[in-house]
Amino acid sequence: MRMLMNNLDPDVAEHPDKLIVYGGRGQAARDWASFDAIVETLRRLKPDQTLLVQSGKPVGVVSTTEDSPRVLIANSNLVPHWGTQEVFDELAKKGLIMYGQMTAGSWIYIGTQGILQGTFETFAECGRVHFGSTGGGGGTLKGRLCVTGGCGGMGGAQPLAITLAGGTCLIADTDLSRLERRVRDRYLDEVIADGKWRSGEVEEWQSVKADASKHSATSSIDAAIDRAVAYAKQGKNLSIGVHANAVELLERMLERNITPDVLTDQTSSHDPLTGYVPVEFTHEQAALERERDAKRYVELSTASMERHVRAMVRLQDRGAIVFDYGNNIRQRALDHGFRDAFRFPGFVPAYIRPQFCLGRGPFRWVALSGDPRDIYVTDYEMLKLFPREESEYSSRMHDWILGCHKHPEALLAGKFDECEPRFAFQGLPARICWLGLGQRDKAGLMFNDLVKSGRVKAPIVIGRDHLDCGSVASPNRETEAMKDGSDAISDWAILNAMVNIASGSSWVSFHHGGGVGIGFSQHAGQVIVADGTDAAAKRLKRVLTNDPMMGVFRHADAGYADAAACAKRLNVDIPMTP
């Protein structure tokens, strides 16, 4: 119940009054009557009962066991032949279904931090792969201009992730309030809008102009481009948000013959109606047009997506490193007639899959006490549990956790009262940290011991994104270009949900359409509570071993040598050796 409410905290959700958490229209509950009924049922639920939630509506309570999940959630699921955006929208209008995104409808969204480390891992790997021996960056993005679009709940992680990886970020969004929110939460350094500039350090808007000596235009876009190019040349890891449509930004860069080093996009193209904003409209105009003529709006939206991807491919031809960041924009452009839409790769096959082969993925935890000190204690213990010298990934974990702190030396000394977050917690204090098979269970048991000993004030909730090593089938994202061609097989996501139910997760969810839109993905999530009891310890051991093990099973079966080696090293039981 606390996590459901946390999803709708005004500091967490994008539009809490509409029950929208993030990702266009990803909701926590179908409507307010359903929300109230869920809360009332959870209050009276017995330890051996399980609540069933169908697309954000509580539909039944069944007798189970104390080791069974307290809640089972199914969101947005449709029989494949009818799994289209059009059918979904009709059912949603009738109040029969809800879009759960990934962590919105599964009650484990923790704000932009939830995707931050994964975004950092992506951009850091991009630097290592493409700039390891050139430009003096030492395999980082130092001195590199990284351009992207979409600064919402997910895309808003990009500016901070890029700067943490050493780069300069230029990001466009049509919604000025999103850019201002990211500045407030210290994910974004500066904003340029309507010819004015401000930063987190300067609250008053100040006039800013483009360099008229270099070009005639004096728009905000030109001013933002000039500023970002200058920062990159100076090697400054700063981020600039420009209030503009991403299409306009990219086309202006083409006009000015400016090629970014890295280019991607996280606009809400997974949802052509309520997410993406066509280039013809401002953010405010788009809201009106959706209501006036939804069919025309979708046509304009997909046409803009084609134009968007064409600009990305043109910049790729000019030398930019371009990758798709999982919003399905390539598919939308392809469906609209652009045959070269898949010219650039997705981020998972390009940078992340080697980690999936090891059962690594986005492990997150939340302090139910609401006290940031509890997170600082867990950070400190995580650094002890996984020494830096243990592996390259442990070293990265140390850099990541310390990078989350404004005063890392205070954390290292165990002076928790002197710790401050580098970026703001949203809602309940939380942390994200990528861990693999053989690590997640250790962390979970350690958290349980902290609760038991009283070193933290209240239980800790442990969950993850549905974007994980063995929990999703998404041919245009997580399972793109699988070695054996099994991209579209969703048995694995279903098995993941069943394994987590059998293992004793506190709540388990199975969704359709997260990240890339209706018809393009199926995925499972799990959450488990460390309450300090011996019974919880047994569940934690099972769940946090079996959940990442599904990633090793999945990738070993697909023929990945790293996954097979991981299975052998950790004595994973695979009946038919790959």
Language-model segments: residues:
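Short helix-terminating capping/connector loops at secondary-structure junctions
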Residues: 135-142, 232-236, 316-317, 455-456
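Short, solvent-exposed amphipathic alpha-helical segments in soluble enzyme
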Residues: 163-165, 254-259, 280-281, 338-341, ...
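Catalytic or ion-translocation cores adjacent to nucleophile or general acid/base/metal-coordination motifs
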Residues: 101-107, 111-121, 128, 142-145, ...
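N-terminal ligand-binding/catalytic initiation module
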Residues: 1-118, 124-131, 135-137, 307, ...
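Short polybasic linear motifs
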Residues: 196-198, 202-206
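Core active-site phosphate/anionic-ligand binding loop and the adjoining beta-turn-alpha structural block
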Residues: 190-192, 222-443
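Catalytic cofactor-binding cores of redox enzymes
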Residues: 9, 90, 97-100, 121, ...
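General beta-strand structural signal in soluble alpha/beta enzymes
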Residues: 50-55, 73-75, 148, 171-172, ...
